[in-house]
Amino acid sequence: MPESRLIPISVPKSRNQIAYQLGASVTDIGLPYLTLTAELNKVYPFVYRNFLPAQNYSNSNFSLGDWMGANADRIEFIANYHPRARLNVRAYYRLMKKGGLGTVEQQYYLTPTPVYGFDPQYKTSKISLETSYELYSNVNILFGYSRYQVTPNIQKSVTSNQVNIGLVFSPY
């Protein structure tokens, strides 16, 4: 942690740049072989960035932090069910919001620094339902449907629907 201050997070002049991830998973609740998972990720502005570019949390310009980058959050819900041996049914929902990256001046010289969610860029949502059946060891038949929607702040939203049918070979 190259930059840290002993100022409480609640002080408006502090530049506390944090990210956190909370999650829970419960199995066999109400129905045998059912696993429910919920996860929340929140990355405040300017996390993973430093005044000195050599100290940024990146490798070859790829962030080493969360894939959303700074000033973003997402919530995910997953239900995984195995009604029979070798049969798996999975439902998934994700909602994500992304804000702007900001500038070095905003990060270091603006007091207080911009709050989470400043300069909103877009929202995305994804819902999917997949089922797979294991024919042989590491050979699965897969069928799935997903709906993905991107809503930029200055344009109309774009929605894509996708149906997947396939034969999956896995060496592990």
What is each PLM-predicted segment?
Residues 1-172:
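Exposed, low-structure sequence patches enriched in small/polar residues
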